[in-house]
Amino acid sequence: MTEVLVVADCWQREPDSEAVIQRAVAAAAESVDEDVADAEVAVMLTDDAGIRTLNSNWRGIDKPTNVLSFPALQPEGGWKPGDAPRMLGDIAIAYETMRREADEEHKPFEHHLSHLAVHGFLHLIGYDHEDEDEAEERETLETQILAHLGIPDPYADRDGTH
């Protein structure tokens, strides 16, 4: 189950955001492991000021970003299929940064929002991008999940490798 909490008025411009996030997180959960499909995720829709505060407080980076993930449980060695906790964690998405990226990349708002929700969800279950191999694995999985939703590969125009 995904709970969406809107804490910034700017999200009112996109009334379908909650449904987009629900669908994206459900697709990600189902594609990874059946046990995860029943776990809880909270998604906070905030603005650049809100996510900047979170980024500064939790990561020591004093600037806004598009999405942050806060896993509820991070077992040593990473999450394993079948070991999903009841509450996976929280995701925060910043409206202005997300909107700007979508516009700059000529992507529909809903597609980019879906991508960030999937990206954030995968972080909750241990997928990372600290090195090139991890990033490639996560990007491949993101692309597969988004394709299931009818969304084109978000990385296709970047380097032509997907």
Task: List PLM regions with ranges.
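Extended, folded domain segments that form the structural surfaces/walls around functional sites
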Residues: 116
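An acidic/histidine-cluster motif and surrounding catalytic segment
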Residues: 1-113, 124-162
